[in-house]
């Protein structure tokens, strides 16, 4: 910093002896001169009268105070000394020095003892190898390294037992309950606002679980919804009494209609036997209008068909009670899947009309149907006289049918019809890593005009949980299935299975090429465990499947469930797949399959299931069920060899053929079918032999490593196996029911036993033959037998000769 003091000039001597300044940027000026020698006397003449300045000059310099540096250094020294005294010295004294002493003592002691055995230098290395081997084993077995256990694989294929063990720990029952609660929070009939909310929820769940493809596939189909409904009856005094009805008194796909003062007749379960009995007794007569009062049977659409056949103008169904609650109403669909499933408008998916000859086979009833409660049914029954005949209720009870004119009723049903209404399916996909042109479908129905907790919501919640389990296994182990998996939530179930049917109709060829199995879980419920004598508890599951897969399901029975396996025996969203030869499997709980109350009523709410799930045993049953579903689906999609057992397939058909022959002896010639089965049996033996050889090479000796040539052979076998089902179809379909192409497996038009032995008839095998027998047309029955034999032989020949993927067009 510059001083305000201005210096005067000095001599060179003075400059050389000047004291340096504190700052190099300034000049220190001297106000006096210094002389080394004393002054001489000769200099007295020189006067040095120099007057000092009145005030000393002011200097402003930036000079650091050395005391500050000293203070800082002292503080750091104190910290350093404190750290050394309190931490380093105790650490050295109490830990490091003892450890060093031990490290010197232990080797010396070890060498001392080892020297008694042998050379310590060699023995020390020997024990070191053992110790390090133990460490390596622990690390490898713990899964910290990326080995077979950590990756869930062995060689080229997955080790499912490892994946399942992880899945057992990953089941999120809380998520299952949350999904079930939300889906059950509102009625969600097809095409309603409730359905829109639910299918968006499912779509978001698919997205959140990271499915590669999530797609909404919508279709415009005929649908109807609750509207105006009324039933009135007249007493002996001709006074009119109204039944109190609501929107719950509704059968989806019922026709609209209005009747005035028509006789009411009670018909029990409405079987052909019941109504023929009424007709023989003149209780009902041709040309006279009447309304049938019926108890619900297992197959409601068949009741409607028979009622139409006998001239009924409307049907009133009496609901089953729910415990002591006799006011619940069961809203069962009345579409007619016997002729075909799908859009009930009579139009094909592309809008073209159905052929004229098929108009009478539309999928919708032609008469009004209305469900009422048990209480209301009793009220109407009490008005019938003792005239007419006694009719079996099907519940070990009998009631009077009444007679014409006993009770007159008015019926008015006006539903809200939408000729073309949007119905969506939600599709998600996990892509396979090997044969990505082949896939299975895991599906569940979505819609209910009520809350639908038991059916179908339980199955939908299970579907979402299975998706989550698959993805958790995928992310944990880097797992991918060998083949594709599709997850589908079907819409339009109450409208004659419109969603699944339209999907099959629009994409039939790609589906037949890719899909080799469909698993439907719509009818699942809590598998309530029953206690046995040995103290174990086991729930029950019913599996209806294709004969090719029967051995697979019997072999993979779950230790906590009693599983019964049979052929498919009822309608559902799987029906259009079955009709076109695609093997299907339906996993059900008996109570849900039979639609026991409160299913299909307004009482089927989440609160009831929530209380059931408070029991730990029921919680465990649900967890076991989800793991079992994951197990069977993973085995189907990720095992190298398809689980299609041809010998079991042949034996099953042969067994059902024998039943048919016993039911109708000396009526039909089954030689052509037997020849076809023998051809398939030979193929089955070759497949079993090849399978055994493959397992010996890959698993027994190859440790999961498959040679390339063997892989190609395996893919060829798998592809040929997937064509078995589709090749049992006839392009023309069944007589009068062209929708059903599968000549081996499918529904009989009317499922009533007319055999002599009774009770031993299968209504879902050889449907064309059974239709002809029901009509007493034995010539047509033999033609259908011969057609089945021809199809079996041709499909076997194609299997042997096949080089390309050939199917009926």
UniProtKB/Swiss-Prot annotation:
<protein>
    <recommendedName>
        <fullName>Putative zinc metalloprotease TRE2</fullName>
        <ecNumber>3.-.-.-</ecNumber>
    </recommendedName>
</protein>
<feature type="domain" description="PA">
    <location>
        <begin position="255"/>
        <end position="349"/>
    </location>
</feature>
<keyword id="KW-0378">Hydrolase</keyword>
<keyword id="KW-1133">Transmembrane helix</keyword>
<feature type="region of interest" description="Disordered">
    <location>
        <begin position="1"/>
        <end position="66"/>
    </location>
</feature>
<dbReference type="GO" id="GO:0004180">
    <property type="term" value="F:carboxypeptidase activity"/>
</dbReference>
<feature type="topological domain" description="Extracellular">
    <location>
        <begin position="147"/>
        <end position="809"/>
    </location>
</feature>
<feature type="compositionally biased region" description="Low complexity">
    <location>
        <begin position="37"/>
        <end position="50"/>
    </location>
</feature>
<comment type="similarity">
    <text>Belongs to the peptidase M28 family. M28B subfamily.</text>
</comment>
<keyword id="KW-0479">Metal-binding</keyword>
<keyword id="KW-0482">Metalloprotease</keyword>
<feature type="compositionally biased region" description="Polar residues">
    <location>
        <begin position="1"/>
        <end position="12"/>
    </location>
</feature>
<feature type="compositionally biased region" description="Polar residues">
    <location>
        <begin position="20"/>
        <end position="30"/>
    </location>
</feature>
<feature type="glycosylation site" description="N-linked (GlcNAc...) asparagine">
    <location>
        <position position="669"/>
    </location>
</feature>
<feature type="glycosylation site" description="N-linked (GlcNAc...) asparagine">
    <location>
        <position position="228"/>
    </location>
</feature>
<feature type="topological domain" description="Cytoplasmic">
    <location>
        <begin position="1"/>
        <end position="125"/>
    </location>
</feature>
<feature type="transmembrane region" description="Helical; Signal-anchor for type II membrane protein">
    <location>
        <begin position="126"/>
        <end position="146"/>
    </location>
</feature>
<dbReference type="Pfam" id="PF04253">
    <property type="entry name" value="TFR_dimer"/>
</dbReference>
<dbReference type="InterPro" id="IPR039373">
    <property type="entry name" value="Peptidase_M28B"/>
</dbReference>
<dbReference type="Pfam" id="PF04389">
    <property type="entry name" value="Peptidase_M28"/>
</dbReference>
<keyword id="KW-0472">Membrane</keyword>
<dbReference type="InterPro" id="IPR007484">
    <property type="entry name" value="Peptidase_M28"/>
</dbReference>
<dbReference type="InterPro" id="IPR046450">
    <property type="entry name" value="PA_dom_sf"/>
</dbReference>
<dbReference type="GO" id="GO:0016020">
    <property type="term" value="C:membrane"/>
</dbReference>
<feature type="glycosylation site" description="N-linked (GlcNAc...) asparagine">
    <location>
        <position position="736"/>
    </location>
</feature>
<dbReference type="GO" id="GO:0046872">
    <property type="term" value="F:metal ion binding"/>
</dbReference>
<dbReference type="GO" id="GO:0008237">
    <property type="term" value="F:metallopeptidase activity"/>
</dbReference>
<keyword id="KW-0645">Protease</keyword>
<dbReference type="InterPro" id="IPR007365">
    <property type="entry name" value="TFR-like_dimer_dom"/>
</dbReference>
<dbReference type="InterPro" id="IPR036757">
    <property type="entry name" value="TFR-like_dimer_dom_sf"/>
</dbReference>
<keyword id="KW-0812">Transmembrane</keyword>
<keyword id="KW-0325">Glycoprotein</keyword>
<keyword id="KW-0862">Zinc</keyword>
<keyword id="KW-0735">Signal-anchor</keyword>
<dbReference type="GO" id="GO:0043328">
    <property type="term" value="P:protein transport to vacuole involved in ubiquitin-dependent protein catabolic process via the multivesicular body sorting pathway"/>
</dbReference>
